[in-house]
Amino acid sequence: MLDLEAIRQLKYAYFRCLDTKDWEGVAACFVPEATATYPHHECESRVAIIDFLSTAMVPDLITMHHGHHPEIEIDNDRATGTWYLHDRVLAPAFEFALEGAGLYADRYVRTVDGWRMEHTGYARIFESTSTIDSGVKIEQGKRSRGE
């Protein structure tokens, strides 16, 4: 049970660090040789993952990532996990909004520093985009800009 909770906490930290643009925190979730598969982009190292995410998720982009209903299987020092993703993206400067769902498929490895991701990636179940009405007020918190 402790390993299950440690893996859940790792994924929760990944989502929190992603939305607060804490790139060092995101990097700490991965082993150096980690890989990632995002829609329309693949990464072959932890450095490549952080480069991609920090470039795609500019400070003015507001995001919310929630991971639900983890299905985690542990085999000694390795584990796999499937997570249900619900995400929202707001880009007020472009009057753009996205909401979607998907399934994450992760692989984890136990290291001397605890559990880390060796692969993450998701496939969409749906994605809905819309325009933000100019009368809608969106106030971005400092934490969402990485401050």
PLM regions and their residue ranges:
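Short, charged/polar micro-motifs that form catalytic or ligand-binding hotspots
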Residues: 16, 39, 94
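A solvent-exposed, acidic/Ser-Thr-rich amphipathic alpha-helical stretch
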Residues: 23-87
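Short, low-complexity N-terminal intrinsically disordered segments enriched in polar/charged residues
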Residues: 1-32
